[in-house]
Amino acid sequence: ATLIAKFHICFEEGGVKKGDKIALCAKNSAKWGISFLAINTYEAIVVPILADFTPESVNSLVDHSESVILFTNADMWKKLDIKAMPRVHTVISVDDFSLLYTSHENVRTAMKNLQAAFEKKYPLGFTRENVNYPTDNDKELAIINYTSGTTSAPKGVMLRYECLSANVEFGQEHIPSHPGDKIVSMLPMAHMRQMQVAHYAKCSFVRHAD
């Protein structure tokens, strides 16, 4: 939650508004999940892109989705062409959350002085009371998920928050899991099924310690 709050500061400095698109193209990791939730809880629209797509496809989908920020791995970033993604003003590494690129000096300054900005925003400290995410946005667009393009060019599927919550509720009811259970999945987290089963559904079980 602390990292998510810090990313929200960066989004604010970058002029990101509710409903703006932010692309996420990276290998499976805990930081993928943190990046996703940072975007999602800011009420920006997440654009997950499969990390095994060609650099040309990633360039094309980031541009097609009208994304303004890109989260990706450093090795993928080396293969991308920022000129092919003209709306993107900031690129953040999912490897270590460092800044890979920005055309906004205020974003660069915010990233450099992020801890100070965080402490200024939360002068009494960051507590569970500060973790307050939207719950009244079921009908609003949450994700643009591009298909793998097995039989044709990838298509962007537009999903509302209620689509995600309905799948989570179904999974909890019909495929229950418990603390200590192990889940084996070979799908990338940008794949809708992996995102629902191993990411969203598991996050819904998080509880604060008493």
Region locations from a protein language model:
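Conserved AMP-binding/adenylation subdomain of ANL enzymes
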Residues: 165-210
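Residue-level detector of anion-binding/catalytic polar loops
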Residues: 45, 68, 208-209
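Conserved AMP-binding/adenylate-forming
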Residues: 6-53
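Conserved S/T- and glycine-rich ATP-binding loop of Class I adenylate-forming
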Residues: 22, 39, 70, 141, ...
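Conserved pre-ATP/AMP-binding loop-to-beta segment of ANL
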Residues: 109-146, 153, 176-182
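Conserved adenylate-forming
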Residues: 82-109, 203-204, 208-210
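Conserved ATP-dependent adenylate/AMP-binding module captured primarily in the ANL superfamily
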Residues: 51-82, 167-184
